[in-house]
Each structure stands twice: as C-alpha cells, then as structure tokens.
Swiss-Prot record:
Keyword terms, alphabetized: Nucleus, Transcription, Transcription regulation
Recorded name of the encoding gene: SNAPC5
Keyword Plastid set for record: no
Annotated segments matching region Disordered: 75-98
GO CC annotation, single: nucleolus
Protein's UniProt name: snRNA-activating protein complex subunit 5
InterPro entries: SNAPC5 (IPR029138)
GO BP: any one term: snRNA transcription by RNA polymerase III
Amino acid sequence: MLSRLQELRKEEETLLRLKAALHDQLNRLKVEELALQSMISSRREGEMLPSQPAPEPSHDMLVHVDNEASINQTALELSTRSHVQEEEEEEEEEEEDS
C-alpha cells in the first residue's frame, strides 16, 4: 500500500513536470503566433496603401520569430515510462544503501 502511494506520488511529480514543460512550449508557440499575425497584418496594410512607400522596418519594429532549430532545442520527454523506471532504480539503490 505504501509503495503504491509512493509510485503515485512519483507519477504525479512526473506529470506535473510534463505539464509545466508543455505549458512553456504552448506559451512560446502563442508568442510566435502573435508575431506572425503581426507580420501578416503589417504586410496587408502595406498592400492596401500602395500609394505610400513601405517604410523600412526599424530594428525595434522587427519581431524575432523562433526558427525551427531554436524551437527544437527544448526536448520534451513525453514518455514517462523511462523516467519512472529511472526513479524506481534510484529508489531501489537508496533502499539497498539503507
């Protein structure tokens, strides 16, 4: 009974870490989406006003959009099985040391 409770607590911790990682990634994607929407709307405004020359975007106006390489730098471990197994092995080692 106690070991099952410990397993559930470890699983909960793993799921909470996974939730946080996914939440961070979701926030990054939302920021990127807003940046892309801003770029699209500014281009549409430029197309609607062809009589005026398009202003050169200043450095402050440029929106940094993550490229694929920087997005992929964040590795998400969606498989909790390997993490749980590692924790179980660590727990067994601790029990053996006791």
